[in-house]
Amino acid sequence: MMRSLGRAGLLVLLLAGGQGAWAEAIPAAVGRISYGDTPAPGAAICSGALVAPDLVLTAAHCVRGAATDPASIRFDAGWSGGQPGGQRRGAAVILPEGTPVAGMAGLAGDVALVVLEAPFPPGAVTPLPLTDPAGRSFTLIAFRRDAPDQPPRRDLCATLATAPGLLGLGCAVVSGNSGAPLLARDGTGWRIVAVMVAASRGGPVRSWAVLPPAALRLRIPSSAGGSGG
């Protein structure tokens, strides 16, 4: 499911897709977001990442419709080959303040947190910290709608453009990738730089990712990765 953002030629993805992978283990904090019970073939899914034991970072358009029924949101951490590393239901949705707007300004606000019904216990799934972008090449780890039970894709994404609160990237995305973390790796492990939110038609920029704003970062306990290097 997609929606157009006018002249910017942007398609907001409600969910995941793609191909390409490395042998290195994918962090279990990256998970699949679905709705209701077991998702039917072709049903809407999104991607997300655990940033605290009870908080999942994702795209706002993935969870805005479920804000009044957060228990319908299901997060499967470490989903691989049909097997979750851990499953939780939503308890609340934290959305940006204000009414959503169209265009690039609205795209920059397309990020949210899902509060889980119960935290993952220590050692079960390690949350990913956030960091500011450094360099121009990042890693996207995301699920895809047409293969929801498969391990997530991993692609390299080069930054080709910037806009306020946004990174324009050279990697193509498909339905299901929305909400996926754009990651950087340092000596301590993976860190979240941005959240994938849209595909772009025409020109070298193929997708857009949101840099989590300060107001949202303040909702994440610092000990759980609310700030980064």
Task: Map each language-model feature to its residues.
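Bacterial N-terminal signal peptides that target proteins for export
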Residues: 1-10
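Catalytic nucleophile loop of clan PA
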Residues: 49-50, 172-196
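A conserved glycine-rich beta-strand in the N-terminal activation segment of trypsin-fold
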Residues: 30-53, 179
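Conserved catalytic-core segment of clan PA serine endopeptidases
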Residues: 22-28, 35-40, 64, 70-120
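Cytochrome P450 catalytic-core helices
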Residues: 54, 58
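Chymotrypsin/trypsin-fold serine protease catalytic domain
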Residues: 108-111, 115-173, 177, 205-209, ...
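Short beta->alpha transition motifs characteristic of CBS
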Residues: 59-62, 175, 193-202
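N-terminal signal peptide c-region/cleavage motif recognized by signal peptidases
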Residues: 17-18
